[in-house]
């Protein structure tokens, strides 16, 4: 992403996802200012979740697409989808903010979950969203990895305290790298 590079091939195909090679070769690219780019995600999974208690809570207090309103997560619907079930989590983090576990300015911690296994793995937690990161800047990427993991640990603690079935849970793993959604456009 930065530093000295040499490309010696006669022809290249830019498959970087960020138009890195196209930009270096002088192609016309555009990139919004960091504050205008889509937020990045830090994905993670938890283990030690009581599946039965977690699913019972989900059924007792189901989240819908209407619950996505506000914060970083918003979804535009025609209205008919508003009452449909969605694997969305916001309430544990709102409670954590109210109790001072999560700072008020981090009201962006919320999002979706994937599956909960019989072994107690709660997977594909897409709860941490970081604004103003330029995915073509190594310093921004490093800052995002550090801050994203810090926020993920807050999210794990909030889930343990405020989401039934997660009382004995712990971090299982992080995704390989921060999820960047938008950089350069050709």
Please provide the spans of the model-predicted regions:
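Flavin (FAD/FMN)-binding glycine-rich loop and adjacent Rossmann-like elements that form
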Residues: 2-11, 15-186
């Amino acid at each position: 992403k930065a530093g000295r590079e040499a490309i010696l091939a006669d022809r290249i195909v830019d498959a970087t996802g960020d138009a890195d090679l196209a930009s270096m070769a002088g192609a016309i690219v555009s990139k919004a200012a960091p504050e205008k780019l889509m937020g990045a995600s830090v994905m993670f999974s938890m283990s030690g979740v009581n599946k039965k208690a977690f699913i019972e809570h989900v059924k007792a207090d189901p989240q819908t697409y209407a619950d996505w309103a506000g914060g970083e997560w918003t979804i535009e619907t025609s209205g008919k989808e508003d009452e449909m079930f969605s694997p969305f989590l916001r309430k544990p983090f709102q409670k954590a903010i109210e109790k001072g576990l999560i700072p008020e300015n981090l009201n962006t911690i919320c999002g979706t979950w994937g599956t909960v296994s019989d072994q107690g793995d709660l997977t594909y937690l897409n709860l941490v969203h970081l604004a103003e990161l330029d995915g073509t800047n190594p310093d921004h990427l490093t800052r995002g990895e550090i801050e994203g993991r810090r926020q993920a640990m807050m999210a794990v603690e909030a889930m343990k305290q405020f989401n039934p079935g997660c009382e004995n849970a712990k971090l299982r793993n992080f995704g390989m790298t921060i999820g960047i959604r938008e950089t350069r456009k050709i």
